[in-house]
Amino acid sequence: ILRIVAFIGACKGTDVKKLLKYVFYTTMAGCLLLMALSAAGIYGRLALEADFGRGYTQVRYCFGLGHPNALHCMFMMLVLLGLYLYNEKMKWYAYVILFAMNHALYLLTDSNTGMLITFCGIFGGGVIHYWKGLKGKKWIYLAGAVVFLLCVGFSVLAAESRFAEPDYVIYQFRNPLVAEVESHLNGRIRDLYYGSIRCEGTTATWSLFSEPGNHYYFDMGFVRVFYWYGIVPGLVYVILNIWLIWRFYKNKDGMGLVMLVVLSVYTVVEAHLISVYIGRNYLLFLMGMYAAVMPGLCSGNEEEGYIWSVPIVFLKLKK
């Protein structure tokens, strides 16, 4: 948590757009290098042949990134970051090219989640670009906040055994909603209940703050937030994302909203953003960019404040 706070604080007062361009090009160069080394047989596996939980063996390409889902995930992150940086300058054919690249990569990775989220991100970027005035409408930001809260809410409910109603005899769920969603998530929810002795990740293993023993890895990202860091930091994380959506609205940052919403849906299924490698969560850069303008932290000629200085605001109000 301290690393994340320091990371956000380091972004304060910097040209985050310029920083994100550096992140974009260095990440893309690194991924292309890994793919080239893998294709040449020098480093990393080109493809994996296994049963990926679908009941049959298949060959899926990863090009040195370890797993097909990871390959499509990195493509998705680069597309979203590229759209955030250059969406306003893009022509219609650029979206067509991105759609085609996404489909071509899907033929190699067969990563359903990565393909669908990337598709939604490209489509959302196109809508923001061509629907003039949409990024200034309050309702789209309210809708984005609702989607984010639904993603968090479902993740919490899925981790609660009294809601999910796991059946430890047949390894299924008696709750029809959870059972139906799990049939499309390829074992993500099942892993919480049947993947470890203590049912790591379920609400029974959560604590108010982080515990040294809570270090188990699983895919569901929002569940990992509360399991790894604790309930209180998890709630702070939720509040910060809602605040970030509000800042998107105030700054008419439509592409920022698209990025946050599609990544929220992705984080229900995957934990790419909830990782010890905090630099790959591009939303943290945006939190840092907007942190200095937290309501009440600066006014007129007052010294600029940090987002974690909120308690000072309440002390000022009492005076």
Task: Give the residues covered by each predicted segment.
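Charged/polar, solvent-exposed surface patches and flexible loops
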Residues: K21, Y171, Y194-I197, R247
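Long extracytoplasmic/lumenal interhelical loops at the membrane interface
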Residues: F173-I231, Y237
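Extended, basic/helix-rich recognition subdomains
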Residues: P166-V169, I189
